[in-house]
Amino acid sequence: MPKRKDIQKVLVIGSGPIVIGQAAEFDYSGTQAALSLKEEGYYVILVNSNPATIMTDAEIADKVYIEPLSIDFIERILRKERPDAILPTLGGQTGLNMAKNLSEAGILDELRIELLGTKLSAIEEAEDREEFKALMERLNEPIPESVIATTVEEAVDFADTHGYPVIVRPAYTLGGTGGGIAATHQELVDISANGLELSPVTQVLIERSIAGYKEIEFEVMRDAHDNALVVASMENFDPVGVHTGDSIVTAPVQTLSDREVQMMRDAALKIIRALKIEGGVNIQMALDPQSYKYYIIEVNPRVSRSSALASKATGYPIAKMAAKIAVGLTLDEIINPVTGTTKAEFEPALDYVVFKIPRWPFDKFATADRRLGTQMKATGEVMAIGRNMEEAMLKAVRSLEIGVTGLNDLTFDELSDEALLSALMPARDDRLFMIADLLRRGVSIETIHAKTQIDEFFLDKVSHVVEIERDLSTHVGDIEYLLYAKKNGFADATIAGLWGQTAAEVRKQRHDANVLPVYKMVDTVAAEFESQTPYFYATYERENESVRSKKPSVIVLGSGPIRIGQGVEFDYATVHAVKAIQRAGYEAIIMNSNPETVSTDFSISDKLYFEPLTLEDVLNVIDLEQPLGVVVQFGGQTAINLAQPLEENGVNILGTTVDDLNRAEDREAFDQVIKTLALPQPVGKTATTVDGALNAAQAIGYPVLIRPSYVLGGRAMEIVSSDDELQDYMQRAVKVSNDHPVLIDSYLVGQEAEVDVLSDGETAVIPGIMEHIERAGVHSGDSMSVYPPQYLSQKVQDEMTAAAINLAKAMNTIGLMNVQFVIHDNTAYVIEVNPRASRTVPFISKVTHLPLAQLATRVMLGEKLVDMGFETGLIPADDMVHVKAPIFSFTKLPDVDSLLGPEMKSTGEVMGSDTTLPKALYKAFVASNIKVPQYGNVLFTVADADKAEAINLAKRFNNLGFALFATSGTGAHFAEQNLPVDILDKIAESDNNSVAALRSQRLQVVINTTQADDRAESDGRLIRNAAIENAVPLFTALDTVSAFLDVLESRSFTVNEMK
């Protein structure tokens, strides 16, 4: 069937900010879809609230709107643009829920706008628990015994009848939000109450637990002619009970018989046909390991995290195909872009193994509960490809960037065999390392299987890795064992550890013995047809399929898995660097390990190496490709950390030299630059011992800001106010040494601001100054940023501009640099310099219309800014105001304290733009899912230091008609100032307390700045958690409250008595 001619304009809805459960995979799928529709000649309008995406670049669609994904704003865009159709299935759960809401509001019918790809009835049948259950019963497909509950009592009745444990699955939520496994009555009451609160339709499915069954996923495609195929089958290493986003996953399935695969494949095809979905679907199933009995767990009627993984695992671009199918093309009409010859109706075939491991944020959040369940906690994931499972598994392990190169780098010596075996359940993020340690101790595969229900096939693969470790340690220097270990994925560093050598020595032995990797192509057809894809992975075999181009090449290092502090912003910069390299006439090569991102779409670069970002793996590619140079500035700390070892191996690092990169990170060298330029800077010292740190802090005077050197996202950064707090920090957060000093600075109270600088060593251009709303002490990644500045004096802006330009020149910056300031007593103090692309690059690029990463890459390749039409200085701003706001995922991590501080906690960002600051702020709050009430009750519970400032804010709320509530200390202070206030008791004292008020929906806003306290049961912490659980706007910084009040005041009319 040819593509539809009756539609011309299509609106694509993006997925919004990155949160746990919905990450960069939707930037990848949305970008693919928009480009795919443009390729077919359609006029594409794109709306998304996330500025850190490739998807929101001007060239991706004909019109791009960075606006809140709310009904109000989408309706405005629909009325203005009048598209013929909406494609909602590529924007994750956000896109689907928006389509449903627009339809129910009657907007689609009124404007005669059609939904493409998936009809609303199919969305409802898959997402509404009751309709899904009815459909499965009609199809005679088995689902676990269950009941749809709209009250806690209904949930409890089911469990009392069918027994515990039960699984709670809320309807229309993301990443298992609000769900869980309840083993007791009280757990069920708590989980179901929370799930009902978070479900937009107040509905949860309570089902008999089938935890322990094998979890299998199928990615399925269907077109309007009812042609359907399975793109990929994937098997979870973890049995049912761990959210698939937190599961280790292999592709293709590893432990099923052909009969089992065909049985479940048939069921998947039957379901997509029954739903009449035109596009892609993810179907999750559970298989009883003891029989041929299976259950359908869930159907996602959209492109998902798993489909991004399946696309990268097979090379089959699901989102691109789904977009073409949505406009009427059929699978037998679409060419498979990987082969360039076969049609899209051919099911991909794999002659390799893919291994995905999630990346969790527990290195950032020491207090978080590391146990895994049905609610997702991972921020990102890595994928690795190998010729056998051991190879793929070990490549994935070293891709995680958690300081390990193999399974023997993380051991649990402090635990007995019994304690370690017991710690395996419930599953934790480090279970793979626990299993290896148990096997090393001689605990049997059968014992571990009985405890975890992980298939013995997978456990045997881990056991094989442990056996190879043992063999290596008794055959030091043996090349035969070395080759066998390399074929099974062992890193040089792991082998070096077992041989008592350095990784460089092992590398030399390997090269001397000609034990070198070859590169195989990912071609979707298991080499059955000729292929033209430039997508490769390393393995230790004979035939190399990657041929070095005659054209000079440049390698760009990606940023690895998405984690807090290093998000999709760096992938954005990586993709732009590739475009600039290609336009300059070079071959652009990407190395990355993240299956969710645009950079690992093989059509972006001239060559893609899906490999770990370690020194060994990068050098192997460099040995083959012999590039002109390597770009490290866009890969976050991952790539920057490789700069020096790469240079030591003779690699040409493009842009700022390694010596100058190190000068920015080395405290004494950097201080020297600051002194030479006579720039104001907070008093700071370096310490390499605990006593040295105490002496430094006492000399500077408390409070001090303390942090390790070489970090990203403020990891292990704190403000401490006494010797006791400092000693606690030194024991808990860092291992201090000569090689790893800590930096101690005077903590200056003041507003923060920052600039990105583009420099070629002679000309330094500042695209804009970003002013933070929160004062110093809140990490810049967690602050709201405003461009252009609204409150900074001209004197301060001039000081910042001059300081940044002088720093760029003094540091010999070639490319990008980020400079952060604190404004104290109307003077700009330099607090940090990052000699690389920062997380603000996408935002400042969008609002100034300057492709900074591309310009920086051109500079690295030798172009001069003067020749591009730039001169040194600050570029003037236009009349619009833009706000970048952080997004947090605290609902997924209830054990993490939401009080903001110098350690970064946000997972994503949104942008609000308008003609005035209050309007831009309003959009930013709406895009952040912060309700902006017109009136209601506001709770104040603030630290002593904040009480005077809180009075003014409370008066402003009171003038708007809000009723004031407070905890006892804050309330007494308000009463002294004659403010009308209702005082709530301490939580332990009575039911008239803040948490109860939040649970009963009596409070509309919570302002809580009571200091962090490691006790999870402290009142401040419990109030913060209750606000998050009940979706009540929570503010932990008074500056943000003031900005929120600016919005409320701008939207309200004054009512005054006549004088």
Curated annotation (Swiss-Prot):
Bound cofactor: record note: Binds 4 Mg(2+) or Mn(2+) ions per subunit.
Cofactors named for this entry: Mg(2+); Mn(2+)
Pathway membership, UniProt: Amino-acid biosynthesis; L-arginine biosynthesis; carbamoyl phosphate from bicarbonate: step 1/1; Pyrimidine metabolism; UMP biosynthesis via de novo pathway; (S)-dihydroorotate from bicarbonate: step 1/3
Keyword Manganese: yes
Region (Carbamoyl phosphate synthetic domain): 547-929
Binding residues annotated for Mn(2+) 2, in chain numbering: 298, 300
Positions contributing to Mg(2+) 2 binding: 298, 300
One Gene Ontology term of the molecular function aspect: carbamoyl-phosphate synthase (ammonia) activity
Catalytic reaction(s) noted: hydrogencarbonate + L-glutamine + 2 ATP + H2O = carbamoyl phosphate + L-glutamate + 2 ADP + phosphate + 2 H(+)
Residues binding Mg(2+) 1: 284, 298
Binding site for Mn(2+) 4: 832, 834
Ligand binding (ATP 2): 707, 746, 748, 752, 777-780, 820, 832
Ranges for domain ATP-grasp: 133-327, 671-861
Annotated Mg(2+) 4 binding sites: 832, 834
Pfam families named in the record: CPSase_L_D2 (PF02786), CPSase_L_D3 (PF02787), MGS (PF02142)
Residues at which Mn(2+) 1 binds: 284, 298
Sites where the protein binds Mg(2+) 3: 820, 832
Binding-site positions, Mn(2+) 3: 820, 832
PANTHER family: CARBAMOYL-PHOSPHATE SYNTHASE [AMMONIA], MITOCHONDRIAL, CARBAMOYLTRANSFERASE FAMILY MEMBER
Similarity remark: Belongs to the CarB family.
Quaternary assembly: Composed of two chains; the small (or glutamine) chain promotes the hydrolysis of glutamine to ammonia, which is used by the large (or ammonia) chain to synthesize carbamoyl phosphate. Tetramer of heterodimers (alpha,beta)4.
Domain free text: The large subunit is composed of 2 ATP-grasp domains that are involved in binding the 2 ATP molecules needed for carbamoyl phosphate synthesis. The N-terminal ATP-grasp domain (referred to as the carboxyphosphate synthetic component) catalyzes the ATP-dependent phosphorylation of hydrogencarbonate to carboxyphosphate and the subsequent nucleophilic attack by ammonia to form a carbamate intermediate.
Protein name: Carbamoyl phosphate synthase large chain
Gene source species: Leuconostoc citreum (strain KM20)
